[in-house]
Amino acid sequence: MNQTKCIFYSAILMIFCAPAVHSQNLTDIYCGHLLNTETGNWLRNALIKVDQGSGRVKELASYTTVSKDNSGSSLDLSDQFCLPGLIDMHTHISEDVSGDLIEFYTISQEEQLKIGRVNARITLMAGFTTVRDVGVYIAWTDKKLRDEIDAKMTPGPRMKVAGYYLTIPGGGGEVAVPGYEGEVPDHIRAGVARGADAFREKAKRVIEGGADHIKLIASGAVLAYGSLPGSPEMTQEEIAAVVEEAQKTGIRVTAHAHGALSIKQAILAGVKSIEHASLIDDEGIELARINGVSLTMDVYNGDYINEMGLLDGMPEEFLEKNRETTEIQRANFRKAHQAGVKIVFGTDAGVYPHGQNAKQFSYMTKHGMTKLEAIQAATVRAAEVLGMSQEIGQVEEGFFADIITVSNNPLIDIKSLEDIQYVIKEGYLYKDRNKQ
């Protein structure tokens, strides 16, 4: 067992030996400072009234004094900087950090779910109240976890899930380990296809199965054997077939695409969201801009792999591909941002430890964004890409009462978002700095 995994399972023991997550249903939340994520302005002395039945904000007002009742339904955050709950647009919550892909051949879905439940709680405690989970190797694990969270059986962020990857045989979305001669479970290959008609059928099945969006693997991957990040895997015709099927039901499609050609093919095929975009060229940037395509660029992830990859058991092939893509991705992040392309916050958490998601904010500001733009990427801009711009990403009347707090102004100290003090999701208090 590698060092990171030892740390991870130690964390599991600590979590399950600790008291249950604190959950308190609130009606009145008193925020000393509340960030308007559209304007960047702070609202002083904001009183947020919550409808307990729906978990949504029913009134946003102001206060002069904090009124406390004996029911425990009010919360004094007058010394805090309050923001809407954060959104991570690229997670793998049911997976942990490991370079040993053979594990996916033998682990059961229930075992994978146990890992996911721990990671869901960790992610929520880090201030992320919504995530777009973009693929699992064991089909539908993400859906089961989503449904448990929605039923309040498991504490975690609101999840929008893909069900499984759509990928070519041996592609970046399939577990393919050189020299492995054992049995490959069917649930590992649920989305494997070749040809436009076959991919159209796979898209139909994943939609009917309950996916919130579709994740397809357009190019090679960094963390896959024999897969080259710059090389196309799916054809433009195959991608277009998936998009056409998804459009029938309004399902959104996002494409894993490192390579410049795959990025352009995905955009021309109608995909509206690109993951990684490491090797995007000027033509791809312009195509993304004029077509309103968002980029999810995980600009922190490369440093973690460089520093911890060997300890996590990652083979040299993976580490070398990571070295080849890390800095060019960051340069292209800056270019795309300067060109006016919408960039949303997404970390690839699962490749590095869950709960460290907020480390990416400082990388986004280092490579060209203002602090407000980085926060917007994880709130209002991400909500737009999810199709939830009237529900999350802001604290406004009618929106879900998802609120997090920090002790310092994140527009001055962006790293304060790495130390969340309170977490409220749908009016329920899940994290209280005084009751850890």
What is each residue range found by the language model?
Residues T27-D28, L34, T39-L83:
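Histidine-rich, glycine-flanked metal-binding segment
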Residues R44, A378-V380, E384, E397-Q436:
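C-terminal cap of metal-dependent C-N hydrolases
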Residues Q80-D147, A151, P169-G170, E237, ...:
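Metal-associated gating/positioning segment near the N- to mid-region
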Residues E95-Q112, G172-I188, V222-Q236, V293-T326:
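Active-site gating loops and adjacent loop-to-helix segments of metal-dependent hydrolytic enzymes
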Residues S98-L101, D142-K143, Y225-G226, I263-A269, ...:
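Histidine/acidic-residue-rich catalytic or RNA/ligand-binding cores of hydrolases
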Residues T106, K248, E317, E324-N409:
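His/Asp/Glu-enriched, well-ordered alpha-helical/loop segment
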Residues G116-W140, P155-Y165, A211-V222, R252, ...:
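Divalent metal-dependent hydrolysis catalytic cores, especially in the metallo-beta-lactamase
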Residues K144, A198-A218, V222-S294, R323-I343:
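Histidine/acidic residue-rich metal-binding segments in metalloenzymes
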